[in-house]
UniProtKB/Swiss-Prot annotation:
Family: Belongs to the bacterial ribosomal protein bL9 family.
Gene this protein is translated from: rplI
Record key words, sorted: Ribonucleoprotein, Ribosomal protein, RNA-binding, rRNA-binding
Function in brief: Binds to the 23S rRNA.
A Gene Ontology cellular-component term: cytosolic large ribosomal subunit
InterPro entries attached to this UniProt entry: Ribosomal_bL9, Ribosomal_bL9/RNase_H1_N, Ribosomal_bL9_bac/chp, Ribosomal_bL9_C, Ribosomal_bL9_C_sf, Ribosomal_bL9_N, Ribosomal_bL9_N_sf
Ribosomal protein is among the record's keywords: yes
Chain segments annotated as transmembrane: none
Pfam families per record: Ribosomal_L9_C, Ribosomal_L9_N
Domain of life where this protein originates: Bacteria
GO terms of biological process kind: translation
Gene3D superfamilies, per database record: Ribosomal protein L9, C-terminal domain (3.10.430.100), Ribosomal protein L9, N-terminal domain (3.40.5.10)
Key word Ligase present: no
Protein name: Large ribosomal subunit protein bL9
Length: 147
């Protein structure tokens, strides 16, 4: 029996795979629990169209991320914070302050996709990575100065 999986199933296949299973396993378990549907010609055609649309959508998202990466490429930030007499920062500079500095420049970036490698606790130059897509990321230099 040929079926189309609706979710990942261990030792059988991944979502949207067309697999052959024994009739009893398909009819009595996979189809009633909603984990699969029968791979009829119309279902195969719908699956192909769905995969085509999904690929097109993912390609558009990647292009948008690459366009934003090109805009962010030349950006460098200056973040002013309160500093002690020894040059250490009260607290630290995190992705929240970097997102706010980018917002002031007109780039609304979610703070969750900004990664700062090391803890920023002193005045100086650092780099943050903005992960716009799983294949597209931008390194943004920023300088921490005394307020």
């Amino acid at each position: 029996m040929e079926i189309i999986l609706k979710e990942d199933i261990v030792n059988l296949g991944y979502k949207n795979d067309i697999v052959n299973v024994k009739s009893g396993y398909g009819r009595n378990y996979l189809i009633p629990t909603g984990k699969a549907i029968i791979a009829s010609p119309s279902a195969k055609k719908m699956l192909a169209e769905d995969l085509k649309q999904r690929a097109h959508k993912l390609e558009k998202i990647k292009k948008d991320a690459e366009a934003l990466a090109a805009k962010l490429e030349g950006v460098s930030l200056t973040i002013a914070t309160k500093v002690s007499s020894t040059g250490t920062i009260f607290g630290s500079v995190s992705n929240i302050q970097i997102a706010e500095a980018l917002a002031k420049l007109g780039h609304e970036i979610d703070r969750k996709i900004i990664v700062v490698k090391d803890a920023v606790k002193e005045v100086g130059n650092y780099k943050a990575i903005v992960k716009l897509h799983k294949e597209v990321s931008v390194e943004i230099p920023f300088e921490v100065v005394a307020e």
